[in-house]
Amino acid sequence: MKFVDEAEIRVEAGDGGNGVIGFRREKYVPKGGPDGGDGGDGGSVFLQADENLNTLIDYRFERFHRAERGQNGQGSNCIGKKGQDLTVMVPVGTRATDSDTGEVLGDLTRHGQKLKVAQGGFHGLGNTRFKSSTNRAPRQKTNGTPGEIRNLKLELMLLADVGLLGMPNAGKSTFIRSVSAAKPKVADYPFTTLVPNLGVVRQDAQRSFVVADIPGLIEGAADGAGLGIRFLKHLERCRILLHVVDIFPVDETDPADNAKAIIEELEKYSPKLAQKPRWLVFNKVDLLLEEEVEERCQHVIDALGWEGPVYQISAFQKMNLDPLCNDVMDFIETLPAETEQEEEKKEVEFKWDTYHKNTLEAHDEFEDDLGDDLDDDDWDEDDYDVEVEYRR
């Protein structure tokens, strides 16, 4: 199936049902009082993460999603049925952003996690809500409010523990083939990898981590060169980055310049991402003599001013891969659990929330005036009358 990691959709919550004007009319109860019911709330729209999905391609063709409208109220104080909520299934790792305001509504990082993205309309009030000691036969009602409408940008960001970073043909895909069961395409030309790939590295039955391989970066990627930097977002949730450096490039470029270019593009994309733990991994050491390997590696380290961990491997020959994977596994296990790292998320403010609260507060005073039950037969006593004048 084609990998699609971005899609734009429009979600529309259901409108609230209208309240009605009604009066109780039964035999021997000629003036039974108001009994118009409230409408039902409109259905809301939710996103839910599903681990069985791995692409957003469905939403390239299915862009409009609408929840059900609330039913209108009825007589006998019958409240309208609430509109059915709509749940849109998305892959785990999806981020929802309001396209119009740029507000990030939330990230869905766990299977089954739900996120409300459009609030259903508030129900209209029936005339029963407006009765009081001075308004015994109210003819007022309110209509339901419209449901919220949002244009959403969905971005799928892969969930992985380790992210591979480097130039095209640095050997990232070969690395992931050697340490996991993933089989990404490998060839002797740049940009063989066009979409991200995931692989699971198993140290033993109980210990494993996930590696993400993204298409290679080149100088000027931030300005659109090559495949650009759109795939760097898949590294945002990684806990550690492996910067793979080809010490024997086929185009005879300087490995130090290549490594600098990658770091610069990373910082242009996101300073926060550039601050993640990053290890330097020199690949293709089997193609040079040991003295040349040490010389070239030291040249890159000096050019970068590097002080972090350094590894020398050959992904093709599977040389020195076990020590690297063991150290990565040990490092990941020392990090706090992801749930502990999560920051408090801001509550999403929906369009009609303030209106709902104000409307309910405005009518609370009427509830306090109700001394009798709504179904009391002596609600409308004989010692008063209400005159209604109709005009054409």
Curated annotation (Swiss-Prot):
Which Pfam family, any one of them, does this sequence belong to? MMR_HSR1
Q: Where does GTP bind?
A: 166-173, 191-195, 213-216, 283-286, 314-316
Q: What is this protein called?
A: GTPase Obg
Q: Which GO terms describe its molecular function?
A: GTP binding; GTPase activity; magnesium ion binding
Q: What class of enzyme is it?
A: hydrolase
Q: Where in the cell is it found?
A: Cytoplasm
Q: Which GO terms describe its biological process?
A: ribosome biogenesis
The Obg domain covers which part of the protein?
1-159
Q: Which PROSITE patterns match?
A: G_OBG, GTP1_OBG, OBG
**How is the quaternary structure described?**
Monomer.
What's the domain of life for this entry? Bacteria
What protein family is recorded?
Belongs to the TRAFAC class OBG-HflX-like GTPase superfamily. OBG GTPase family.
This protein's cofactor list reads: Mg(2+)
Gene it is expressed from? obg
Q: Where is this region: Disordered?
A: 121-146
